[in-house]
């Protein structure tokens, strides 16, 4: 393994995977006797590598190769024959008139539709992303907006769609960016007076995937440039897939015209996974790691960790790491011992007072209204929702929940839980309220 490969291996361990795939994987290395030349597909990557990674690359190169001279070039690494005949010159960064966007190196190939665990909370999002990948640019799902809390699988679906497009058409120009990367690229273009080039680079793609567009809020110039990019891609029938941490109309600081454009296609909420999906996710992630996890341990984690997929993965990573270190088998007792602090913190985060306040705020009530004896519909339904959420999200018994709601009988709590479950099968608004409250309480 040469010095660059060893340096890249260390960088992969130190930086987030999505950053490595976006900025470092597209680089082509030309390792010379006393220097390293890194070739990047475009000026964006040169800028990001110079600002964020170059100092660390030089440190690693000094350690592995004994020198720290690193030069950044835009273009492709010369072929060996050409390199032998080419005159020796000092490398320097230069910008070609039309640098190309790195269409292959910024998609994480690990995330596919095949390894996405489907459940009631995400099945519509999965279907929408799959359709967007099968028929990119179709007005029925262009743009496709996936929204929901952190760690629920939005980015997984986005990567899966991009990877499926490239699998179907290896020449497809699919570009993934986080919103702050779009912002940084635009700022750099403004500083260097290369906005025309910036616009051309983003408008030549077949599919543009941007994560976390709530970051655009309050950034007027960024929204303006994205608005024009959006229009050009939409008119050209190029697929746009976006994610947001909430429904865009709820994002303050996002321009009305941009919110209107986002409503042109399909917007799908990704909700926190239910118990069955959480258990399936734990078992699937364990299989990916080659770990043996008994079903009862997966059920324990799924029951206690209710917020998002990342928390489930974190619990699983902690469990398998300690099992490997100690050589102990993963049992229910071992899991409870290992995850004790994590599970306690999770339970403390979702308490009865927290649920009562969240429900009261959502329906424009006060907590005392939920606890009162009044039975008007405007109070009874939110009260039932709060009781049902408490049963769903905590370990409290029915009598304990009744006590917390002004000493109500446990049969009242049971009736509330059954009533809400039954109504949600036919009442779309109630289902929407329930999902939003789950999301708020899981944040």
Swiss-Prot record:
Plays an essential role in the initiation and regulation of chromosomal replication. ATP-DnaA binds to the origin of replication (oriC) to initiate formation of the DNA replication initiation complex once per cell cycle. Binds the DnaA box (a 9 base pair repeat at the origin) and separates the double-stranded (ds)DNA. Forms a right-handed helical filament on oriC DNA; dsDNA binds to the exterior of the filament while single-stranded (ss)DNA is stabiized in the filament's interior. Residues 106-323 are annotated as: Domain III, AAA+ region. It is found in: Cytoplasm. This is Chromosomal replication initiator protein DnaA. The lineage of its organism: Bacteria, Pseudomonadati, Pseudomonadota, Gammaproteobacteria, Lysobacterales. Its main location: cytoplasm. It comes from Stenotrophomonas maltophilia (strain K279a). One of its GO terms (cellular component) is plasma membrane. Residues 67-105 are annotated as: Domain II.
């Amino acid at each position: 393994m040469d010095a660059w490969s060893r340096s890249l291996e260390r960088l992969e361990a130190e930086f987030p995977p999505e950053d490595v795939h976006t900025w470092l994987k597209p680089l082509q290395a030309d390792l010379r006797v006393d220097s390293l030349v890194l070739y990047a597909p475009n000026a964006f990557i040169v800028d990001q590598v110079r600002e964020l990674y170059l100092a660390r690359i030089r440190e690693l190169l000094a350690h592995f190769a004994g020198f720290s001279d690193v030069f950044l070039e835009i273009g492709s690494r010369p072929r060996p024959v050409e390199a032998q005949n080419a005159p020796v010159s000092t490398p320097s960064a230069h910008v070609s008139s039309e640098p190309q966007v790195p269409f292959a190196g910024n998609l994480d190939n690990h995330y596919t539709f095949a390894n996405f665990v489907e459940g009631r909370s995400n099945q519509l999002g999965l279907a929408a992303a799959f359709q967007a990948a099968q028929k990119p640019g179709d007005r029925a799902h262009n743009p496709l907006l996936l929204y929901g809390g952190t760690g629920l699988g939005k980015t997984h679906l986005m990567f899966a769609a991009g990877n499926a497009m490239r699998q179907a058409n290896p020449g497809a120009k699919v570009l993934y960016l986080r919103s702050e990367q779009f912002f940084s690229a635009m700022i750099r273009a403004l500083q260097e007076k290369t906005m025309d080039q910036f616009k051309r680079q983003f408008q030549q793609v077949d599919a543009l995937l941007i994560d976390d567009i709530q970051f655009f809020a309050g950034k007027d110039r960024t929204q303006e440039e994205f608005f024009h990019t959006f229009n050009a891609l939409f008119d050209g029938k190029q697929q746009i897939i976006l994610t947001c941490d909430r429904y865009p109309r709820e994002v303050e600081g996002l321009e009305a015209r941009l919110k209107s454009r986002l409503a042109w296609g399909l917007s799908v909420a990704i909700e926190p996974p239910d118990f069955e999906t959480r258990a399936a996710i734990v078992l699937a992630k364990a299989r990916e790691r080659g770990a043996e996890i008994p079903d009862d341990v997966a059920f324990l984690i799924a029951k206690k960790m209710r917020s998002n997929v990342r928390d489930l993965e974190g619990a699983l990573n902690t469990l398998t790491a300690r099992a490997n270190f100690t050589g102990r088998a993963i049992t229910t007792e071992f899991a409870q011992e290992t995850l004790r602090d994590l599970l306690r913190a999770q339970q403390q985060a979702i308490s009865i007072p927290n649920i009562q306040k969240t429900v009261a705020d959502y329906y424009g009530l006060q907590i005392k209204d939920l606890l009162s004896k009044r039975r008007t519909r405007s109070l009874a339904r939110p009260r039932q929702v709060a009781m049902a959420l408490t049963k769903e999200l905590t370990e409290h018994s029915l009598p304990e929940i009744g006590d917390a709601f002004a000493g109500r009988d446990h049969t009242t709590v049971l009736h509330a839980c059954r009533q809400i479950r039954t109504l949600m099968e036919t009442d779309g608004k109630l289902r929407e309220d329930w999902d939003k409250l789950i999301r708020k309480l899981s944040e």
